Amino acid sequence: MNSLFASTARGLEELLKSELEALGAHDCKIVQGGVHFQGDDRLMYQSLLWSRLASRILLPLNEFKVYSDLDLYLGVQAIDWPSIFGVDKTFAVHFSGVNDEIRNSQYGALKVKDAIVDSFTRKMDQRPTVAKQQPDIRVNVFLQRDMASVALDLSGEGLHQRGYRDLTGQAPLKENLAAAIIQRSGWQPGTPMVDPMCGSGTLLIEAAMMASDRAPGLHRGHWGFTAWNAFNEALWRELTTEAQVRARRGLLETSSRFFGSDIDRRVIEMARANARRAGVAELITFNANDISKLVNPLPEGPVGTVISNPPYGERLESEPALIALHNMFGRMMKTAFGGWRLSLFSASPELLSCLQLRADREFKAKNGPLDCVQKNYQLTANPLGAGGALVAEDYANRLRKNVKKLDKWAKQQGIECYRLYDADLPDYNVAVDRYGSKVVVQEYAPPKTIDPQKARQRLFDVINATLAVLELPSNQLVLKTRERQKGKNQYEKLAQKGEFLLVSEYNAKLWVNLTDYLDTGLFLDHRIARQMLGKMSQGKDFLNLFAYTGTASVHAGLGGARSTTTVDMSRTYLEWAEKNLRVNGLTGQQHRLIQADCLSWLSNTDEQFDVIFIDPPTFSNSKRMETTFDVQRDHLVLMKELKWLLRRKGTIMFSNNKRGFQMDLAGIAALGLEAKEITALTQSEDFARNRQIHNCWLVTHSQEEK
């Protein structure tokens, strides 16, 4: 009787135990990451050939205490290695774990290798060769605290490598995990199975192998036991011959049929090739199709199971499309697959909620480093596709109401960019902005007291509802997460798509970028202020400080300004401003662009202007600025500098976004200036609920100064 250990992915231990017991294993004991079991040689080879769930089968050789590297060396050398494999064979060591003395797995592997080689040289005066690629013998050493376990890896390569999958698409599932997903799905051999997002076909092929009684190890070309001195070749030949007979018979007798589709034709060709190598190609029908074209391949029956591992996004920009995909998929399941079972495996339970289906079973498992969930559903017939209530219904109703009012208003105003929703409801803390044909959803970062998974779920519900209410294709929605910006992070670059969209604002055309930066290049709340500046600037010299993308300069220029001067520290934004000016025909020497620290430039210029617009950051500590800037603390210093640039009958429009900003009116008067708040005049209909989004002032020379 052999003592053996079968390893597997975490979360699959109970399934593996049941599988080994069905094969005839005795004394099965679950530990994290695997199962200890007992069995004779036949059972040992059967487990290697037939286990669909095990990652490796190990034969323990020795276990000993390790307090130093010498203990490790002596414990390994105590094993009679020449009795295990011949000196003419190659070997490799896999070492995992550390303790206070063995702090590096590579060092541990080196000590084990030395001990094995020295064992041969002392007894035979010869040494075996180490081979990193496909060695004849693999030695597995696991160190946990002060205990080391040495085992012969009978598998060689991991058992998930069945031998049929040479080519894979992106993010493939390991075959043993795919087998576990199928077993947990409730699918029964003899019934049909559909995978509408099949990738390289692993789920379908594994199920077809189960249905046709094909041993998962039948196609492997390399094993870790064939160079073992105790290898029973006759017994192995008997078992593999028996498995081949069963596979041929199973292929003829199975009534199961399998259907797979994927949008990627190249991946579908890989799937077909994989199925041919696995010997189950005649059972599986593959098609290259977009999931939106999914139909039930057996509308008249029998009913079966839909099993899939749908895509999930690690990048924020992919989430709207994935949310739309899951929502559409849920509707298709209800309309076309009534009476079927559905089982989905995903690293994103929040995306699965977008199906709007109620799961009746749920399992957890690891897919490499990812925590994943598998959910099973019973699909009820629903030919009209009517689901339950729309997710985030309160939000959807508010958005629908706002859209009805604001779309009409915006058309009358002659604007394409405006806010549709701004955290109107506390549970849905997002801003929704329309930019022509596209929509930007910005999530305000939730408080730390809110469960991150709950916040993510709520965001997904918002996106789902936004797409539905606005009848928007998912590629027209851009998702951003907005946090309170401080100093150098305020213009942080998020992506590098370089996609610009030309939009209209009154008589101006402006370039926006919805993906690459936290902001889009157009501050919507300053729309009326820009319009006012256009009217104020006719025949005047206009200065735009902290100019960002120069949108105020565009309005001033279109309003008939004699000249515009646009100053910003960022080369990127000045180039953007130049594009904005050029698309409106505002070119030539009278439209200057200056890259400079605005505060330093103010101190060093002797020019004068009729209209000055300044919208400084609330706080800034840019590397290019010598000191920090705080708008509340420093606005008087700013006004003192601006006074010398302002012509006698000129006007400064001063705006900022600091909530609770207090203008030092006494200090302003002492400078010989007058300030008048015009915040209410600059706030538009789409920002009616957020009166504190900015404050705005007109500052002029006092009567005495004039």
UniProtKB/Swiss-Prot annotation:
Protein EC: 2.1.1.173, 2.1.1.264
Alphabetical list of CDD domains matching this protein: AdoMet_MTases, THUMP_AdoMetMT
Primary subcellular site in the record, as a coarse category: cytoplasm
Domain of life: Bacteria
Gene Ontology MF annotations: 23S rRNA (guanine(2445)-N(2))-methyltransferase activity; RNA binding; rRNA (guanine-N7-)-methyltransferase activity
The THUMP domain, residue ranges: 43-154
Pfam families (UniProt xref): Methyltrans_SAM, RlmL_1st, THUMP, UPF0020
SUPFAM superfamilies membership: S-adenosyl-L-methionine-dependent methyltransferases
Cellular component per GO, a single term: cytoplasm
SMART domains, sorted: THUMP
Family per record: Belongs to the methyltransferase superfamily. RlmKL family.
HAMAP family from the UniProt entry: 23SrRNA_methyltr_KL
Function: Specifically methylates the guanine in position 2445 (m2G2445) and the guanine in position 2069 (m7G2069) of 23S rRNA.
Protein name: Ribosomal RNA large subunit methyltransferase K/L
Taxonomy of the source species: Bacteria, Pseudomonadati, Pseudomonadota, Gammaproteobacteria, Enterobacterales
Gene from which this protein is expressed: rlmL
